[in-house]
């Protein structure tokens, strides 16, 4: 099936889904959140997903990231169908190929910036010294070489988000999934964070899928898809 859909080969999508559905139970009711989503993300592509609150944007991102399972349909990451994989294999594939950035940074408060950023490498099996070296390099790239020993509570909002971006990119993933990464920041800091994401995307050739309410930001992406009532209704 993956071969028929063009999931393999050097030009294959980094991330793709076919006929994706997600339904939740709310008491006696079945609530359809996503209905028949098809998507293919090319290597190095920047994509925005927009839509009103409750349209299914974050749910879609969770499914694409293998953090939740669809009610129906399939997600392919790096050519592998996620539904056929064990939890261990899914976790390994996520760690190797995906980075996650959220509106709220989700940094571990008891660890320093360096320790937070080194975590994905350690989980992926790197020796502590190598994970630390990679973390130091990416923190320098995001302009935080002098803040590596600070804990999240000692950093500004913009600095915390830069640490989160460094953590997402430290393993050089093939795709970044960003859920409102600038939504909790003032306009000046939000612009700096978007520019940083774009610069690192260009430097590493990483694909970027960003959920956002910011129409101006979305217009700067390669492609924008609009979700309404669980379906894509517009592409531009």
Curated annotation (Swiss-Prot):
<dbReference type="GO" id="GO:0089705">
    <property type="term" value="P:protein localization to outer membrane"/>
</dbReference>
<comment type="function">
    <text>Part of the ABC transporter complex LolCDE involved in the translocation of mature outer membrane-directed lipoproteins, from the inner membrane to the periplasmic chaperone, LolA. Responsible for the formation of the LolA-lipoprotein complex in an ATP-dependent manner.</text>
</comment>
<dbReference type="InterPro" id="IPR015854">
    <property type="entry name" value="ABC_transpr_LolD-like"/>
</dbReference>
<feature type="domain" description="ABC transporter">
    <location>
        <begin position="15"/>
        <end position="236"/>
    </location>
</feature>
<keyword id="KW-0813">Transport</keyword>
<keyword id="KW-0547">Nucleotide-binding</keyword>
<dbReference type="GO" id="GO:0044874">
    <property type="term" value="P:lipoprotein localization to outer membrane"/>
</dbReference>
<dbReference type="Pfam" id="PF00005">
    <property type="entry name" value="ABC_tran"/>
</dbReference>
<comment type="subunit">
    <text>The complex is composed of two ATP-binding proteins (LolD) and two transmembrane proteins (LolC and LolE).</text>
</comment>
<keyword id="KW-1003">Cell membrane</keyword>
<keyword id="KW-0472">Membrane</keyword>
<dbReference type="InterPro" id="IPR017871">
    <property type="entry name" value="ABC_transporter-like_CS"/>
</dbReference>
<dbReference type="GO" id="GO:0005886">
    <property type="term" value="C:plasma membrane"/>
</dbReference>
<keyword id="KW-0997">Cell inner membrane</keyword>
<dbReference type="GO" id="GO:0022857">
    <property type="term" value="F:transmembrane transporter activity"/>
</dbReference>
<dbReference type="InterPro" id="IPR003593">
    <property type="entry name" value="AAA+_ATPase"/>
</dbReference>
<dbReference type="GO" id="GO:0016887">
    <property type="term" value="F:ATP hydrolysis activity"/>
</dbReference>
<dbReference type="InterPro" id="IPR017911">
    <property type="entry name" value="MacB-like_ATP-bd"/>
</dbReference>
<comment type="similarity">
    <text>Belongs to the ABC transporter superfamily. Lipoprotein translocase (TC 3.A.1.125) family.</text>
</comment>
<keyword id="KW-1278">Translocase</keyword>
<feature type="binding site">
    <location>
        <begin position="51"/>
        <end position="58"/>
    </location>
    <ligand>
        <name>ATP</name>
    </ligand>
</feature>
<dbReference type="InterPro" id="IPR027417">
    <property type="entry name" value="P-loop_NTPase"/>
</dbReference>
<dbReference type="InterPro" id="IPR011924">
    <property type="entry name" value="LolD_lipo_ATP-bd"/>
</dbReference>
<dbReference type="GO" id="GO:0005524">
    <property type="term" value="F:ATP binding"/>
</dbReference>
<protein>
    <recommendedName>
        <fullName>Lipoprotein-releasing system ATP-binding protein LolD</fullName>
        <ecNumber>7.6.2.-</ecNumber>
    </recommendedName>
</protein>
<dbReference type="InterPro" id="IPR003439">
    <property type="entry name" value="ABC_transporter-like_ATP-bd"/>
</dbReference>
<keyword id="KW-0067">ATP-binding</keyword>
């Amino acid at each position: 099936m993956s071969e028929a859909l063009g999931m393999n080969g050097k030009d294959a999508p980094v991330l793709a889904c076919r006929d994706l559905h997600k339904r939740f139970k709310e008491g006696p009711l079945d609530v359809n959140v996503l209905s028949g989503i098809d998507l293919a993300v090319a290597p190095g592509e920047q994509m925005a997903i927009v839509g009103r609150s409750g349209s299914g944007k974050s749910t879609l991102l969770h499914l694409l990231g293998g953090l939740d399972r669809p009610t129906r349909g399939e997600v392919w990451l790096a050519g592998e169908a996620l539904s056929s994989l064990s939890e261990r294999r899914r976790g390994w594939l996520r760690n190797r190929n995906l980075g996650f950035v959220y509106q709220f940074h989700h940094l571990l408060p008891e660890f320093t910036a360096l320790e937070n950023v080194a975590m994905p490498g350690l989980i992926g099996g790197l020796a502590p010294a190598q994970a630390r070296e990679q973390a130091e390099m990416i923190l320098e790239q995001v302009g935080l070489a002098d803040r590596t020993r600070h804990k999240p509570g000692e950093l500004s909002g913009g600095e915390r988000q830069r640490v989160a971006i460094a953590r997402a990119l430290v393993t050089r993933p093939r795709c970044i999934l960003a859920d409102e990464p600038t939504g909790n920041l003032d306009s000046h800091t939000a612009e700096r964070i978007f520019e940083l994401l774009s610069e690192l995307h260009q430097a590493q050739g990483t694909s970027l899928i960003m959920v956002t309410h910011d129409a101006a930001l979305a217009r700067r992406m390669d492609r924008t898809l609009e979700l309404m009532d669980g379906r894509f209704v517009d592409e531009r």
